[in-house]
C-alpha cells in the first residue's frame, strides 16, 4: 500500500445511498478521483449471502478498472475469497492477529480510538489505522462520540511512519483541519453518498494541499 492511497478514501454500502444506484455512485467517485474504496455493507437492509458477495464482486471489478484499491470491511473471509486488496477491521471485530495471518501481505487497516488500541494495531503490523469519529456523524449508528483532532495529532507525532486516515463527519469545509492535524487522508461516506455533484465534491477535496493525484 502506498501512503497516498489514503488521501481520499471512499466508504460505501447499499444503505448509504438513496437517490442513485450504489454502483453508479461508486463509478462516479472512481472516475472523479477517489484513491481507495471500502465496501461497508451494514444496517437493517444490508445485503447478505450471495447477493452481498455478488455486489462485492461488482464493486471490486469497478475498482480494478480504475486501478483503485478495493477494501472489504470486517469480513476477512470474504476479502480472502475475493482476492480483495485488503480488509479493514475494528477493535471489536475478528482478532487482529488472525486477520493479519489470513490477509498475508495484503492491506490490513484497523480502527483505533486510544493509545492502547494504536499500539495493538502496530504490534500486529497494521498497514494503516483509522482514527475517528473526528466530528459528529450520522453514517454509523454505532459510532462513538466525536473525538476531535487531539488524538489524531498525538498519533501522527508518536508514529510518524504509520499511515493514518481520519473519519467521521468530514467534508470539504473541515477536511483541511484534519490534514493539518496530521492525517494522511480522509475517509468519507455521506460527503460523497449524499452529494448532488460527486465530481465537484471530489474536486473540492483534491484542491486541498495534501490531496494530490
Curated annotation (Swiss-Prot):
Gene3D superfamilies: Aldolase class I
Gene that this sequence comes from: thiE
InterPro entries: Aldolase_TIM (IPR013785), ThiamineP_synth_sf (IPR036206), ThiamineP_synth_TenI (IPR022998), TMP_synthase (IPR034291)
EC number from the UniProt entry: 2.5.1.3
Binding annotation for Mg(2+): 74, 93
Record's protein name: Thiamine-phosphate synthase
NCBIfam families listed in its UniProt record: thiE
Catalytic activity: 2-[(2R,5Z)-2-carboxy-4-methylthiazol-5(2H)-ylidene]ethyl phosphate + 4-amino-2-methyl-5-(diphosphooxymethyl)pyrimidine + 2 H(+) = thiamine phosphate + CO2 + diphosphate; 2-(2-carboxy-4-methylthiazol-5-yl)ethyl phosphate + 4-amino-2-methyl-5-(diphosphooxymethyl)pyrimidine + 2 H(+) = thiamine phosphate + CO2 + diphosphate; 4-methyl-5-(2-phosphooxyethyl)-thiazole + 4-amino-2-methyl-5-(diphosphooxymethyl)pyrimidine + H(+) = thiamine phosphate + diphosphate
Biological process according to GO: thiamine biosynthetic process; thiamine diphosphate biosynthetic process
GO molecular function terms listed in the Swiss-Prot or TrEMBL record: magnesium ion binding; thiamine-phosphate diphosphorylase activity
CDD domains the UniProt entry points to: TMP_TenI
UniProt entry keywords in alphabetical sequence: Magnesium, Metal-binding, Thiamine biosynthesis, Transferase
The protein's enzyme class: transferase
Amino acid at each position: 500500500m502506498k501512503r497516498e492511497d489514503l488521501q481520499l478514501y471512499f466508504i460505501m454500502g447499499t444503505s448509504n445511498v438513496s437517490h442513485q444506484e450504489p454502483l453508479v455512485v461508486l463509478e462516479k467517485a472512481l472516475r472523479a478521483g477517489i484513491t481507495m474504496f471500502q465496501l461497508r455493507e451494514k444496517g437493517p437492509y444490508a445485503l447478505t449471502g450471495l447477493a452481498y458477495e455478488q455486489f462485492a464482486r461488482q464493486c471490486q471489478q469497478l475498482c480494478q478498472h480504475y486501478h483503485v484499491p478495493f477494501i472489504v470491511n470486517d469480513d476477512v473471509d470474504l476479502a480472502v475469497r475475493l482476492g480483495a486488496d485488503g480488509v479493514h477491521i475494528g477493535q471489536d471485530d475478528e482478532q487482529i492477529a488472525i486477520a493479519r495471518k489470513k490477509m498475508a501481505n495484503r492491506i490490513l487497516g484497523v480502527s483505533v480510538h486510544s493509545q492502547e488500541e494504536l499500539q495493538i494495531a502496530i504490534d500486529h503490523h497494521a498497514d494503516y489505522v483509522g482514527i475517528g469519529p473526528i466530528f459528529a456523524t450520522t453514517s454509523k449508528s454505532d459510532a462513538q462520540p466525536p473525538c476531535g483532532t487531539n488524538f489524531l495529532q498525538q498519533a501522527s507525532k508518536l508514529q510518524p511512519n504509520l499511515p493514518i486516515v481520519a473519519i467521521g463527519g468530514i467534508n470539504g469545509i473541515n477536511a483541511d483541519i484534519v490534514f493539518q492535524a496530521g492525517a494522511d487522508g480522509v475517509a468519507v461516506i455521506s460527503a460523497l453518498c449524499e452529494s448532488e455533484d460527486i465530481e465537484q465534491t471530489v474536486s473540492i477535496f483534491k484542491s486541498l494541499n495534501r490531496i494530490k493525484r
